Amino acid sequence: MASILQAIRYSHGKLAIIDQLQLPYVEKFITIRTSEDAWHAIKEMRVRGAPAIAIVAALALASELNTLIIHDKLSSRAEEVKLFIREKLDYLVSSRPTAVNLSDAARKLESTISGHADTPGATGRTVAEAFIRAAEEMMTKDLDDNMKIGQNGAEWIIKHALARHKSTATVLTHCNTGSLATSGYGTALGVIRSLASKKALEHAYCTETRPYNQGSRLTAFELVHDRLPATLITDSMVAALLASTKAEVDAIVVGADRVAANGDTANKIGTYGLAVLAKYHGVKFLVAAPLTTIDLGTKSGEDIVIEERPSAEVTKIRGPVDGDHPADIVKLETVHIAAKGIDVWNPAFDVTPSTLIDGIITEVGVIEKEADGQFHLERLFIDNSAS
């Protein structure tokens, strides 16, 4: 397996992200200097993936604060800087409301700086520096959590999903949950990477993931980058794949943008359909997500707000012009692929009921349903003193 792709670059208050709208054709990094830059990058999906947008939002504000410190433009009053940070965090959260990681990160960062601002002798600079440290630690922790998620998921699949005659797993994944969606390594794609590192990966399948094609553009890009045995399929081919005795898919592993208290999971549109197919074909269906994605304040999937995206994402598609051109020059064009005038419904996510989920892979282990047939996710936070 080749080196893991790095999509977020941060050092000493300077942040750059790979522009995912250009992938897989052009690997271009864009500089993020302010919270406004981050808001637009998230809204325009230049960066996406629940963990990644939380990290980019936090580091963008850290970069902005660092610049204000360097140029001596930061208020000396702790209370004013606290309010400035709070307003910026609220603004950043509005860029992608479905992803709980973003609001969770904002809440934790706000708590950190509020506590610091209330300490004797606090100044505007010390409050800003406390925020910067917390944002940087968030990125480090996310990468560590992803490695643990990958390890836990791989071990569970080897133990519970493989038929007796098999020693390697064939896994299907949806959307993009790798280095491009996190600080690095990934959640669901991290599980596939961990299987490969254990020499326990037979094959990986990734769905195209219409309408935004995160699977064909991004996951396929990562799988090729890592030189993993993989095949791209369209979303409508999944049923045929699971029915195929030749493919022998052992597990479907997906990520999550929000997991409700009862285990209902909001993820990229199409996930619900995969879970239904997995249940029918007897294939294990797993959700891979850090504890920060679990929202105990949301009782069930019925309470999750589903973001709706522009109709143009369904009726148009963007890609390079076919033909001869220098390797370093790629001309991207947008073309219509639907009849003009047709109405479009474009929800970005759907909700998979917990009844269809076999396990939720986290950094502290794989959570399964208990004797009553229910997930009891609240116990995770009691056992791990998380909030």
Curated annotation (Swiss-Prot):
Record key words, sorted: Amino-acid biosynthesis, Cytoplasm, Isomerase, Methionine biosynthesis, Nucleus
Residues marked Transition state stabilizer (site): 175
EC numbers for this chain: 5.3.1.23
GO process annotations (BP): L-methionine salvage from methylthioadenosine
Localization (cell): Cytoplasm; Nucleus
Primary residence: cytoplasm
A GO MF term: S-methyl-5-thioribose-1-phosphate isomerase activity
Coiled coil: none
Protein purpose: Catalyzes the interconversion of methylthioribose-1-phosphate (MTR-1-P) into methylthioribulose-1-phosphate (MTRu-1-P).
Protein known as: Methylthioribose-1-phosphate isomerase
Lineage: Eukaryota, Fungi, Dikarya, Ascomycota, Pezizomycotina
